[in-house]
Amino acid sequence: MKAVILLSGGLDSSTILYKAKADGCECHAISFDYQQRHRQELQSALTVAKKAAIAKHQVVNFDLRQWGGSALTDDAIDLPQQRSLDEMSQNIPVTYVPARNTIFLSFALGYAEAIAAERVYIGVNALDYSGYPDCRPDYIEAMQEVFRLGTKQGREGQPIKIVAPLINLKKTEIIQLGNELGVPWELTWSCYAGNDVACGVCDSCRLRLAAFAELGLVDPLVYA
């Protein structure tokens, strides 16, 4: 079974890559260089894909800095730092990139239909503190309908399936799953700051570090 995997190089997407492999899929990973602040994740995506020895990995290039609207695509917007988990849960953060998962899933859908893949794996999870609107179950359900209505395969009764195995998992549970699957955490990248070493203070770093600490584990990634 062929599957397209949305691979950022982060903790979640690396876990779903290994999950797709465990599911017996022939994995075709796709990553995006959209001129994001944290482009270091692309090197992690390349390294993780190589380590996993998948069928194919490619990077799609486009520039979302032309639009801005996010701390990840506009350097004039400061990254939140040193926020507590409670503070992160108050509202949609400035690190939300407008419609990013819709853009990514559209590319993944086109790629999947072109290579006759049956599945698209995405690492969204609705229980993270950063409550992005395009990481929620109702969004995935709506996009599944787009997959059904917007493709030849879908209209012929064989829609490409969106697989979101992390959708109801907490970060600690994702790490536990990744450990079972053998995900190489030391190769992954979560930091938003755009430095050569993970900052340890942005929301993404803090969520990751807190989850490892809650499990009594040491995060193998090096932090500043």
UniProtKB/Swiss-Prot annotation:
GO terms for biological process: queuosine biosynthetic process. This is 7-cyano-7-deazaguanine synthase. ATP binds at L7, S8, G9, G10, L11, D12, S13, S14, T15, I16, L17. The keyword GTP-binding does not apply. Its cofactor is Zn(2+). InterPro entries: QueC, Rossmann-like_a/b/a_fold. Binds 1 zinc ion per subunit. GO terms for molecular function: ATP binding; ligase activity, forming carbon-nitrogen bonds; zinc ion binding. Its EC number is 6.3.4.20. Belongs to the QueC family. It holds the Pfam family QueC. It catalyses: 7-carboxy-7-deazaguanine + NH4(+) + ATP = 7-cyano-7-deazaguanine + ADP + phosphate + H2O + H(+). Pathway: Purine metabolism; 7-cyano-7-deazaguanine biosynthesis. Zn(2+) binds at C191, C199, C202, C205. The keyword Magnesium does not apply. Keywords: ATP-binding, Ligase, Metal-binding, Nucleotide-binding, Queuosine biosynthesis, Zinc.
